[in-house]
Amino acid sequence: MRFFNNKHRAKGLKAEEEACGFLKTLGFEMVERNFFSQFGEIDIIALKKGVLHFIEVKSGENFDPIYAITPSKLKKMIKTIRCYFSQKDPNSDFCIDALIVKNGKFELLENITF
């Protein structure tokens, strides 16, 4: 597990908070934030039109944050989603999304797996 300094963590939490506000404007209902399992964390779990969206928030100023979502990160997210469904309703439709925050702008990339 990686440990970050308080400044880095605070920046990430701020980006997640702003992301939730943005998602609400798109009609998403926040279900849960920062769901942890032994495999990793899901930043935001939101519901829209009966579909659960497991959303990874990435922010950055000097690089394209999408590159921080690696195949390894996606595998950890999938394992964490399985843990979530073992505790919650396993019959929900779902997708994995990325929300990119860069220079105060948001870009939602839905269903980033294939």
UniProtKB/Swiss-Prot annotation:
Disulphide linkage map: none
Q: Which Gene3D superfamilies match?
A: 3.40.1350.10
One Pfam short name: UPF0102
Q: Which InterPro entries match?
A: Restrct_endonuc-II-like, tRNA_endonuc-like_dom_sf, UPF0102_YraN-like
GO molecular function of the protein, one example? nucleic acid binding
Q: Which domain of life is it from?
A: Bacteria
Please give the HAMAP family that the UniProt record associates with this protein.
UPF0102
Tell me its family.
Belongs to the UPF0102 family.
PANTHER family from the UniProt entry: UPF0102 PROTEIN YRAN
From the Swiss-Prot or TrEMBL record, give the protein name: UPF0102 protein HPG27_782
Organism encoding this protein: Helicobacter pylori (strain G27)
